[in-house]
Amino acid sequence: MGDVPQAWKTANVTAIHKKGLKSNPSNYRPISLTCILCKILEDIIRKHVLEHLIENQLLCHEQYGFVPKRSTTLQLLNVMEEWTRVIDNGGNIDVIYCDIMKAFDQVPKCRLLRKISSYGIKGNILKWIENFLTNRTQTVVVNGVKSSE
């Protein structure tokens, strides 16, 4: 455990038409297709890590999405309830929404791994995550023809 085959770290990226003119590139959404065996192992590791985070109460109360019984829909309902309570009590609400483009891609991998380690994820699981995140490649597939990596 700890090693990830290079073939598992290669994504085949293809474009799926969303809407509008097919001649307009912005009307396509990229989809990354990866090895099914890797996806299965990813899910096993995700469940193990999430279980560790929940058991050790390492997730903050505001964490929604990717957490059992804490969907982003529930988050929206909780926020709306809080805002309604504040407004009903004569208060004001100021909201700033931020969408950080490619946020995960901008996180330094060494910092992410240090944070994961500080949460008690160690040994082979941490090695696997580190290996999984390094030397990733992708090819673009158009009409069944692959680009070079």
Features from the language model and the residues they span:
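Conserved pre-catalytic core of RNA-dependent polymerases
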Residues: 1-149
